[in-house]
Amino acid sequence: MSLQQKIKAYLKLGKLGVVSLLDLAAIAGAFLAYKHGISLLPIIPMLIGGTLASMGAMIINSGIEINRDKVMSRTSNRPTVVGYVSRKEVIVVGSLLAVLGTALGFIDNALTAFFIALGVIIYVFVYTILLKPRTWLNIVIGGFAGSAAAWAGYTSLTNSLTLEAFLLGFLIFMWTPGHFWSLALKYREDYINAHYPMLPAVVGITTSARAIATSNALMIPIVLLMGYYISLIALIVFSVLSALLLFLSYRLILNPTKEEAMKSFIFSNIYLMLILLSIIIIKLI
């Protein structure tokens, strides 16, 4: 296997799509803390470190879950499953990236490094190893990994946490279950075959649709409070986006199908992305 193919395999295992959203959360966290006159240079080591650590966590995850990935259609073509890279190799490489990423956080401060490491620990040990194979609450508690990214961004500029930082982290935590349950509903049979107790594999499609809608609805007050805290413009933007999310959630309840679940999943990605981008843009104005 050539070096180029090896790099391509690791980029796939590193889940750049997921990592890019975590990076956006970290950048939004940093800009939430930004005040005119403060240097933005600390964002650079935090972002590089967070990216490497997040990719490392994803890569370790692929090594741990290789046997279950083999029976899931969505993951059956991963480089670990088809034999491009071994379990031992990915765990070593992933661990090195996680350690290097955490070390880069120390360039800013110890608190930033702590939150980078916390994201890895929650995703690998709490979510992947402890909770995912055992309880449908896996993704609920695992959502704190995304919160850690936002907090790492915030502390890179402040070396402290405030109410607004906690709100952003809690927003991401509340967003996570509805988002991933939508994907799990689409691939429900995969999770059943792999014996993962993801909520849609445990309670069925109709109940899952209601749980997704309920989770999204419970998140909205946090989003609106966040918008109110930032500015009137943010509150208006967040309200419009939240109305669209609630509309799609209502449609999913009325028509609990995999197609509607996928629409909910795609829009929830867009929803969080626009929320985070709005924070960055508004704080720059």
Swiss-Prot record:
Keyword Transmembrane helix on entry: yes
Main location: membrane
Keyword Mitochondrion: no
A GO biological-process term: heme O biosynthetic process
Transmembrane segments: 13-33, 40-60, 90-110, 111-131, 137-157, 165-185, 198-220, 230-252, 265-285
Gene3D superfamilies according to UniProt: UbiA prenyltransferase
A molecular-function term among this protein's GO annotations: protoheme IX farnesyltransferase activity
Pathway: Porphyrin-containing compound metabolism; heme O biosynthesis; heme O from protoheme: step 1/1
Topology in membrane: Multi-pass membrane protein
Enzyme Commission number(s) of this protein: 2.5.1.141
PANTHER family with a match to the protein in the record: PROTOHEME IX FARNESYLTRANSFERASE, MITOCHONDRIAL
Known function: Converts heme B (protoheme IX) to heme O by substitution of the vinyl group on carbon 2 of heme B porphyrin ring with a hydroxyethyl farnesyl side group.
Miscellaneous comment text of the record: Carbon 2 of the heme B porphyrin ring is defined according to the Fischer nomenclature.
Protein name: Protoheme IX farnesyltransferase
Source organism per UniProt: Saccharolobus solfataricus (strain ATCC 35092 / DSM 1617 / JCM 11322 / P2)
